[in-house]
Swiss-Prot record:
Lineage: Bacteria, Bacillati, Bacillota, Bacilli, Lactobacillales
Protein name per its UniProtKB record: Beta-ketoacyl-[acyl-carrier-protein] synthase III
Gene3D superfamilies: 3.40.47.10
GO biological process, one term: fatty acid biosynthetic process
Region described as ACP-binding: 251-255
GO cellular component: cytoplasm
Function: Catalyzes the condensation reaction of fatty acid synthesis by the addition to an acyl acceptor of two carbons from malonyl-ACP. Catalyzes the first condensation reaction which initiates fatty acid synthesis and may therefore play a role in governing the total rate of fatty acid production. Possesses both acetoacetyl-ACP synthase and acetyl transacylase activities. Its substrate specificity determines the biosynthesis of branched-chain and/or straight-chain of fatty acids.
Gene: fabH
Length: 323
């Protein structure tokens, strides 16, 4: 069986930066209130950028950085919960913008768990289809799903995109194990982007196109299920959780990251974070963190990484990867 090797990382952020003080001028909040409850200092917000254009920029950077040509790419997977349109897919639009002609492209919507699901699917694709090069991107413009008068959610989210270019290789396994799980009965704890027909008599609530979240329920789910998912993943391999060099969790809230570290009884400094600069970027958060840490020479070849995402669905997904 072949495995996937990450040979390039890349990211793209919108130009506009919105600080906590900027938000304090728009609603009843403060920099101190946001920092103390979330760990977020600022976020990037798309103005002229779209989900597809951000994803395309990442794709172009991946090609340039790796030296792989556009016609060598076999597949493009884009994890997003904030597409520009229902059809065509963000992956199809990004592929066209980046000049790809031979790749098949598809979107994945598992919200904040999407990048982990995408990497797991990529591992399967190289074996079932014989693909050689593929791209997995997380791209979001969550700002269009935010009610900018609702403090409990408006302070959390940011826009951005990041991803990886993977190569199918023989030899020692790199994606050592995965755990994916969805808890549909808890779906109402986090919703956004409701669509409805103009002929439907029972219209959704006015605000249902925007994020609606039961913060306490999501916090409880995330801390319990991320820790449980990581434990299940390690039960599948001959390694211990403590062998992890770095944990890259979905960047939703610093309190969640700290609590998971505590539940797993692992040192907090192994849990990498860039949440303060970007906020919750959903499917983009893990690859954005990975790219920053690879570029900064924090994550190096040969290290054992544990990636775990959680979010709407409610969903959770974890992988153990030998970088």
């Amino acid at each position: 069986m072949r495995t996937i090797k990450i040979i390039q990382t890349a990211s793209q952020l919108p130009e506009k930066i919105v600080s906590n003080d900027d938000l304090a001028g728009m609603m009843d909040t403060s920099d101190e209130w946001i920092r103390s409850r979330t760990g977020i200092f600022k976020r990037h917000i798309a103005v002229d950028e779209t989900t597809a254009s951000l994803a395309a920029s990442v794709l172009q950077k991946l090609l340039k950085g790796s030296g792989i040509s556009a016609d060598q790419i076999d597949f493009v997977l884009v994890a997003t919960m904030s597409p520009d349109s229902m059809a065509p897919s963000t992956a199809a639009q990004a592929s066209a913008l980046a000049g790809l002609s031979n790749a098949f492209a598809m979107d994945i919507n598992v919200a904040c768990s999407g990048f982990v699901y995408g990497l797991t699917l990529a591992h399967g694709l190289v074996n079932t289809l014989g693909s050689h090069y593929g791209v997995v991107i997380g791209a979001e413009t969550l700002s269009k799903l935010v009610d900018w008068q609702e403090r409990s959610t408006a302070v959390l989210f940011g826009d951005g995109a990041a991803g990886v270019l993977v190569e199918a290789v023989d030899g020692p396994e790199r994606l050592l194990a995965a755990d994916l799980k969805t808890f549909g009965k808890e779906a109402k704890s986090l919703t956004a982007g409701h669509l409805w027909s103009s002929t439907t008599w029972n219209q959704p609530e006015k605000g249902s196109r925007y994020f609606q979240m039961d913060g306490h329920a999501v916090y409880s789910f995330a801390t319990r299920q991320v820790a449980a998912s990581i434990k299940r993943t390690f039960e599948k391999i001959s390694a211990d959780i403590g062998d992890t060099d770095y944990f890259l969790l979905h960047q939703a809230n610093q309190r969640i990251i700290d609590k998971v570290a505590d539940l797993l009884k692992q040192p907090a400094d192994r849990f990498l974070s860039n949440l303060s600069k970007y906020g919750n970027t959903s499917a983009a958060s893990i690859p954005l963190l990975l790219d920053e840490m690879v570029t900064g020479n924090i994550v190096k070849s040969g290290q054992l990484l544990t990636l775990s995402g959680f979010g709407a669905g409610l969903s959770v997904g974890s992988i153990v990867y030998k970088y």
